């Protein structure tokens, strides 16, 4: 018997980084707004009759084996730490073979690692019979990722992977709540273009730099996040009203403030893309995730979408054939 699952990646619209504790506690009604895309992280878990552990990432072309879970735990270094730490936590009684594959380009900033951890944690949850609820799976996955990265991680990335669709993640003193937004996937599909700049980035480093600046009392960063928090709430209301002109404007404003937080969030190519697509009819653009390269989201009216796409290709970036993923983590045959 094998257990196979997949979970979608996400594109963040507004409010990112505020989902890292304790930053959201410093703002009134903090929220992040995002949507799931049909770029998937997949995993297959094969139980074994012996104690052997086999871990394989097909997109990274890495495979490693251990005689047992105890040997894995004792290993001074592993090449696939997300897989190893998740397996350590769920601790199956027998050996397993885990094969994963991510469709997200390297360093894309669309939470490929978070989607992978949700898919893998769901499969291991089923294998071991723990029967954890989705919110508990989110907590486990988030803590495993922080343990591997050794920097704080936010919560928003896991919700699109769990539930799909367009959503707001409310960040409150009494907990985190996921709220679906009634936006038809086709309505957003006709208005967004996702480009990959081919520049890997490290979200942990960029997010940590921003977070440290905030907590150290950097007034400019704190002011930027006051504005970003306000924009995220306005973005939510614009989506509820299906006001796409305002949504594009807010996306542009979000990026204007975000790019000022720390050096390295933007790049010359990203700046060229944002400028060129604006002239081609894009209503807004921002980097996905923490920045420093990776993917850039562009919003546009449907009649300008092809022009925007062409300009992106001419500038040397890649357009990813992404659509809204209406469904979150699911089982594969």
Predicted regions and their residues:
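C-terminal nucleotide
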Residues: 1-14, 18-21, 25, 34-35, ...
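DPxDG-like acidic metal-binding loop motif
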Residues: 110-134
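Short, conserved acidic/polar surface loops in the N-terminal third of protein domains
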Residues: 67-68, 108-112
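Short pre-catalytic strand/loop immediately N-terminal to key active-site residues, enriched for Gly-Thr
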Residues: 104-108, 283
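Surface-exposed beta-strand/loop patches in extracellular or lumenal glycoproteins
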Residues: 30-32
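Glycine-rich active-site/cofactor-binding loop and its immediate structural neighborhood
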Residues: 293-295
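Conserved catalytic cysteine-centered active-site region
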Residues: 92-98
């Amino acid at each position: 018997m094998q257990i196979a699952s997949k979970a979608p990646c996400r594109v963040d619209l507004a409010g990112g980084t505020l989902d890292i504790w304790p930053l959201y506690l410093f703002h009134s009604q903090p929220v992040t707004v995002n949507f799931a895309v049909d770029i998937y992280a997949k995993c297959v878990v094969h139980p074994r009759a012996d104690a052997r552990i086999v871990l394989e990432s097909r997109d990274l072309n890495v495979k490693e084996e251990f005689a047992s879970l105890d040997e894995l735990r004792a290993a001074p270094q592993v090449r696939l730490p997300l897989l190893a730490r998740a397996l350590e936590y769920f601790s199956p009684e027998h050996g397993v073979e885990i094969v994963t594959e991510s469709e997200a380009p390297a360093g894309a900033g669309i939470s490929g690692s978070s989607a992978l951890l949700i898919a893998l944690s769901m499969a291991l949850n089923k294998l071991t019979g723990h029967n954890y609820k989705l919110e508990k799976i989110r907590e486990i996955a988030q803590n495993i990722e922080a343990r591997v990265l050794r920097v704080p991680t936010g919560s928003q990335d896991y919700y699109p992977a769990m539930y799909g669709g367009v959503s707001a993640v409310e960040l409150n003193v009494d907990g985190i709540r996921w709220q679906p937004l009634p936006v038809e996937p086709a309505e957003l599909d006709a208005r967004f273009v996702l480009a990959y700049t081919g520049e890997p980035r490290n979200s942990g480093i960029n997010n940590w730099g921003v977070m440290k600046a905030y907590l150290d009392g950097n007034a400019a960063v704190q002011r930027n996040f006051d504005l970003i928090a306000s924009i995220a709430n306005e973005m939510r209301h614009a989506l509820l009203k299906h006001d796409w002109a305002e949504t594009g404007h807010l996306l542009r404003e979000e990026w204007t403030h975000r790019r000022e937080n720390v050096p390295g969030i933007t790049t010359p190519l990203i700046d060229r893309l944002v400028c060129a697509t604006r002239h081609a009819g894009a209503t807004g653009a921002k980097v996905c995730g923490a920045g420093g390269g990776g993917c850039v989201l562009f919003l546009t009216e449907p009649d300008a979408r092809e022009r925007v796409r062409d300009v992106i290709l001419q500038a040397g970036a890649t357009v990813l054939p992404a659509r809204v993923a209406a469904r979150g983590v699911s089982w594969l045959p």
